[in-house]
């Protein structure tokens, strides 16, 4: 037993030693593996597999070398100097474009074009230059026949007017057309350095098995014999590869997305699989994809900007606008015909209150699939709009440009009036004749139309339920929009021509008022668009159209020339078109029919042109500028356009009672107009011969007085002068019975409180001036010293009896205070003389019996003559005052 146990212990000890030695030898082998070179893999493969056939080993070695030559090498040794690859690719591409532009400028015609464009380039802002660089890159990257159209550019940039898209688009097309034919990558040093190695690799031939394997894996355009390719094709291929590899580096990151979507990166990486490809082959260039990154949409407000929407980006893909390159793509584009304006609708409704739109491509696809499931029936394609040509699809020729253009665009000419529209899935313009039935209310608005795209509009509304609910919420939140319209409401027109109050005579212009929901209208920009009026989403307008737009107005005097004119207002309405989908636009809506009076502003200037002065008894300007011929500014009166008989009373106000003047002082709208007598005064207002000295020197600077007296012929009273003398002239006994007022300085104050019994005295001073000298004769007898001074100043050459001056200077106390004023005040304003000569200020004088030189019943013949100048009157008044003071 003991021997067996000893043998067992020895066995386990030996086993432990063997295991220990094995472990030690294993660690040394691991240390040797740290220095193993995997590059020398041929010997290891031969030893492992124990290949006996040397020829098969050589073939396998050649195949592996060929496979390595066609593999993409991602291992870059940073220590190895490569001067041709140290510079950024953008610098090389910039140099290529610069060299091409320098060659293009050798042409005299192109130099002339760029000379005209250079001033515009200097004045462009930073955003406009970024847009220009983006368009230049887009047009240079695009294949022939796939260039961007102006409609696509407008949708990409949001149709912002600040970017000057038409000018920037033309400049980009000019640069593309002038430099593209001069770009030769084979001759350029930079391009040869970039493309020298890939071209040598393409010369390697593929075995049939490798080419078949590459075709099965999805490699495009495998060429087994690339040496037979012509030089022109090689040049075109290099040009396409050059612009394909330019990518987004040429485009500014502020205008174009800095990083492409993940799908594009995955597609590029899946195309080149080093473990499956036998050789790197030339692949055809992909369709041009231009994605515009807008950090903040145009419809986002400042509140939403602060709320966090500014950090989200919306990418607009314009691949749907270009012509597909295969039949499968055409089928996909035809099945998804609404993709073009649906994306534009997403941008348009991004700024509505409480609206969230999916920003990723997957979420958009899910939303479109859900909306397609809800609408089981396929939506038909909408009809084209009726409008004139507004945007030119082709490149606009610059001044001096030849008719021949390198880019030929297809145009469809039609004798009918129409505008070519760019379809969503094709670049070919389609012209539709404007022969659709339309119930027009005006030339720019249709109440009903046969081509109303009801299904398309309803589909857009269903796709944007949140946005439409936000619109309805904003509508119902307003206090005046709580009215619910029934579904059976169509539109109605009033039975009357115009809504009028009871008892009114009617409108001055006949018009038709209609409450309707129009279906199509021309926007303020000149484009015909459909107005959303479907289901619960209605937009009712009050429309009023003149029945006789150019005819004269009714209920207006025949002396006025007038005409009826249509008045328009601008309304913001939710509209729909094929390009943009649902959006808000501005429309010109007829809302009123107005009566316009011709020449009214010329004859009656507005109140702003006349300095408004309040009438008050203490106003020195009003009191000193009154004469017997003051009138009323009829444009300030509410009854200025009444009959001519009423105007007679307005021109003869009551100076004793001053009742009308009290109305003037209390009203801000009515003022007294105080013109002087001009040379065009009618004969019934002309003063007598001797009174011309008193009134002839007052020349008013107001132009409205001349306009007033120029129309005196139609406002002349119907009574004759003899009738006026008998009716308006008081008797001498009546004048004797008038008690004189106590003081002159209280004259204006007492006039406001004078009873109605003194009404005839008001007409006494507004009767024809032939009777006024009756009261002016007696002071000549009391003070005969005045006659030799004033006799030579008379204007009449041979009057029957000399006209004495007025005896205003004989009034005690208050007149002497006026006489002691300095002499320059007398010449400063002729209105002060008018205050002393005003007949209304002379009724307080005691009546005097006329002398035997002048009889009460004697009349003098009326002889109008031109008034004298104001200098003679001032001189006469000055001498009269000097003698009265003495």
Swiss-Prot record:
One of its GO terms (cellular component) is extracellular space. It comes from the Eukaryota. It comes from Drosophila melanogaster. One of its GO terms (biological process) is central nervous system formation. This is Neurotrophin 1. Residues 815-827, 874-886 have a biased composition (Basic residues). Residues 30-498 form a propeptide. Neurotrophin which may function as a ligand for the Toll-related receptors Toll-7 and Tollo. Binds to Toll-7 and probably acts as its ligand in promoting motor axon targeting and neuronal survival in the central nervous system (CNS). Involved in synaptic targeting of ISNb/d motorneurons and also some SNa motorneurons. In larvae, involved in the negative regulation of the tracheal immune response to bacterial infection perhaps by acting as a ligand for the Toll-related receptor Tollo. May be involved in the normal development of specific neurons at the neuromuscular junction. Residues 321-340, 369-436, 675-754, 789-886 are annotated as: Disordered. 'Spaetzle' means 'noodles' in German. GO terms for molecular function: growth factor activity; receptor ligand activity; Toll binding. Residues 698-710 have a biased composition (Low complexity). Residues 508-597 form the Spaetzle domain. Keywords: Disulfide bond, Glycoprotein, Signal. Residues 1-29 form the signal peptide. SUPFAM superfamilies: Cystine-knot cytokines (SSF57501). The record marks 498-499 as: Cleavage. Disulfide bonds join 509-564, 546-593, 553-595. InterPro entries: Cystine-knot_cytokine, NT_N, Spaetzle, Spz/Toll_ligand-like. Homodimer; disulfide-linked.
């Amino acid at each position: 037993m003991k021997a067996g146990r000893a043998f067992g212990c020895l066995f386990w000890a030996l086993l432990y030693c063997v295991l220990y030695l094995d472990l030690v030898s294993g660690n040394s082998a691991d240390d040797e593996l740290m220095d193993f070179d995997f590059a020398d893999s041929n010997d290891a493969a031969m030893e492992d597999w124990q290949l006996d056939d040397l020829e098969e080993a050589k073939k396998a070695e050649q195949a592996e070398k060929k496979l390595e030559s066609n593999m993409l090498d991602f291992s870059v040794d940073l220590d190895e100097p490569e001067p041709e690859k140290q510079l950024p690719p953008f610098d090389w591409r910039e140099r290529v474009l610069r060299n091409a532009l320098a060659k293009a400028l050798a042409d005299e015609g192109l130099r002339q074009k760029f000379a005209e464009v250079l001033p515009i380039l200097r004045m462009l802002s930073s955003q406009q230059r970024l847009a220009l660089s983006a368009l230049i890159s887009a047009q240079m990257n695009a294949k022939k026949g796939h260039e961007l159209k102006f409609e696509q550019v407008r949708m990409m940039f949001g149709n912002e007017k600040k970017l000057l898209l038409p000018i920037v688009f033309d400049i980009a097309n000019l640069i593309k057309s002038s430099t593209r034919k001069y770009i030769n990558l084979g001759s350029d040093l930079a391009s040869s350095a970039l493309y020298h190695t890939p071209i040598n690799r393409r010369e390697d031939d593929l075995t049939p098995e490798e080419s078949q394997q590459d075709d099965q894996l999805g490699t495009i355009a495998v060429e087994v014999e690339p040496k037979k390719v012509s030089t022109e094709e090689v040049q075109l291929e290099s040009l396409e590869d050059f612009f394909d590899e330019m990518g987004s580096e040429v485009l500014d990151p502020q205008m174009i997305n800095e990083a492409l979507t993940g799908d594009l990166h995955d597609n590029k990486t899946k195309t080149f699989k080093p473990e499956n490809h036998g050789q790197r082959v030339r692949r055809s260039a992909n369709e041009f994809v231009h994605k515009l990154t807008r950090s903040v949409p145009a419809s986002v407000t400042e509140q939403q900007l602060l709320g966090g929407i500014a950090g989200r980006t919306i990418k607009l893909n314009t691949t749907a606008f270009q012509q597909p390159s295969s039949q499968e793509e055409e089928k996909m584009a035809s099945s998804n015909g609404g993709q073009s304006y649906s994306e534009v609708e997403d941008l348009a409704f991004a700024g509505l209150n409480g609206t969230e739109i999916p920003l990723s491509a997957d979420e958009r696809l899910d939303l479109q699939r859900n909306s397609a499931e809800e609408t089981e029936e396929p939506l038909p394609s909408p009809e084209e709009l009726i409008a004139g040509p507004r945007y030119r699809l082709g490149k606009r020729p610059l001044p001096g440009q030849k008719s021949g253009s390198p880019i030929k665009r297809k145009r469809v000419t039609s004798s009918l009036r129409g505008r070519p529209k760019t379809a969503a899935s094709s670049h070919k313009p389609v012209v539709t004749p404007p022969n659709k039935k339309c119930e027009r209310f005006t030339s720019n608005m249709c109440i009903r139309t046969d081509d109303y795209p009801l299904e398309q509009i309803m589909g857009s509304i269903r796709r944007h339920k949140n946005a439409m609910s936000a619109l309805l919420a904003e509508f119902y939140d307003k206090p005046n929009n709580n009215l619910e319209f029934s579904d059976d409401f169509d539109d109605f027109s009033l039975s009357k021509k115009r809504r009028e109050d009871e008892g009114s005579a009617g409108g001055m212009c006949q018009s038709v008022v209609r409450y309707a929901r129009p279906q199509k209208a021309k926007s303020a920009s000149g484009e015909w668009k459909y107005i959303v009026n479907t289901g619960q989403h209605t937009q009712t307008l009050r429309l009023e159209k003149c029945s006789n737009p150019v005819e004269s107005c009714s209920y207006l005097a025949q002396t006025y020339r007038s005409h009826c004119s249509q008045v328009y207002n601008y309304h913001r309405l939710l509209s729909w078109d094929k390009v943009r989908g649902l959006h808000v636009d501005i429309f010109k809506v007829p809302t009123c029919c107005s009566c316009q009076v011709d020449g009214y502003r010329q004859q009656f200037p507005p109140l702003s042109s006349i300095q408004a002065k309040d009438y008050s008894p203490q106003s020195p300007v009003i009191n000193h500028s009154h004469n017997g011929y003051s009138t009323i500014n009829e444009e300030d009166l509410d009854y200025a356009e009444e009959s001519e008989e009423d105007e007679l009373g307005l021109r003869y106000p009551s100076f004793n009672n001053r009742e009308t003047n009290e109305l003037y002082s209390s009203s801000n709208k009515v003022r007294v107009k105080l013109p002087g007598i001009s040379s065009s005064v009618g004969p019934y207002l002309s003063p007598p011969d001797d009174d011309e000295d008193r009134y002839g020197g007052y020349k008013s600077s107001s132009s409205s007085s001349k306009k007033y007296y120029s129309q005196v012929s139609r406002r002349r009273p119907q009574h004759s002068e003899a009738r006026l003398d008998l009716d308006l002239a008081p008797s001498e006994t009546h004048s004797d019975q008038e008690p004189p007022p106590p003081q002159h300085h209280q004259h204006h104050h007492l006039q406001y409180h004078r009873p109605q019994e003194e009404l005839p005295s008001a007409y006494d001073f507004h009767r024809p001036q032939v009777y006024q000298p009756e009261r002016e004769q007696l002071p000549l007898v009391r003070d005969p010293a005045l006659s030799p001074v004033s006799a030579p100043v008379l204007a009449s050459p041979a009057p029957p009896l000399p006209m004495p001056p007025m005896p205003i200077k004989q009034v005690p106390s208050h007149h002497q205070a006026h006489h002691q004023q300095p002499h320059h005040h007398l010449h400063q304003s002729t209105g002060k003389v008018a205050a002393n000569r005003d007949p209304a200020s002379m009724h307080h004088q005691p009546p005097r019996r006329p002398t035997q030189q002048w009889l009460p019943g004697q009349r003098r013949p009326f002889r109008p003559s031109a008034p004298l100048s104001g200098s003679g009157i001032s001189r006469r008044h000055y001498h009269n005052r000097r003698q009265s003071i003495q």
